Amino acid sequence: VHLSGEEKACVTGLWGKVNEDEVGAEALGRLLVVYPWTQRFFDSFGDLSSASAVMGNPKVKAHGKKVLHSLGEGVANLDNLKGTFAKLSELHCDKLHVDPENFRLLGNVLVVVLASKFGKEFTPPVQAAFQKVVAGVANALAHKYH
């Protein structure tokens, strides 16, 4: 993904303020609620029977935290997303058999969560830069599928 210096500054500047644990839990939780078919990849997580069950589920929160920490590695390596996510791409493709479309969905949900957390600070240029990043990460995670 090609980002201008200004776009990189938008992303890294805001990312420094992101509470990865909180935002990760909310983004993954929202994904599982809004797109319930994604729950099939999380059978071992226990009760996902309602929105409140999903949002309060400790395993959802823990995995969301893990996802956002990985995304943070991507933000730190914006010029090498494919390399940064190569092992995760392999894991999700070969072992977990996750539909790569889910990476795009999660990226879009993440942008919504960031917008809700940061309000006016999440300006149109910041949103546009984050959309590029989440699209680049989704492509990097889907790389092994091609």
Curated annotation (Swiss-Prot):
Residues carrying S-nitrosocysteine: 93
Chain positions found as Phosphothreonine: 12
Residues annotated with Phosphoserine modification: 44
Transmembrane regions: none
Gene Ontology terms: biological process: hydrogen peroxide catabolic process
PROSITE patterns tied to this protein: GLOBIN
Alphabetical list of InterPro entries matching this protein: Globin, Globin-like_sf, Globin/Proto, Hemoglobin_b, Hemoglobin_oxygen_transport
Tissue: Red blood cells.
GO cellular component: blood microparticle; haptoglobin-hemoglobin complex; hemoglobin complex
Record keywords, A-Z: Acetylation, Heme, Iron, Metal-binding, Oxygen transport, Phosphoprotein, S-nitrosylation, Transport
Binding locations of heme b: 63, 92
Keyword Metal-binding attributed: yes
Modified residues (N6-acetyllysine): 59, 82, 144
Function, as annotated: Involved in oxygen transport from the lung to the various peripheral tissues.
Protein name: Hemoglobin subunit beta
Gene label: HBB
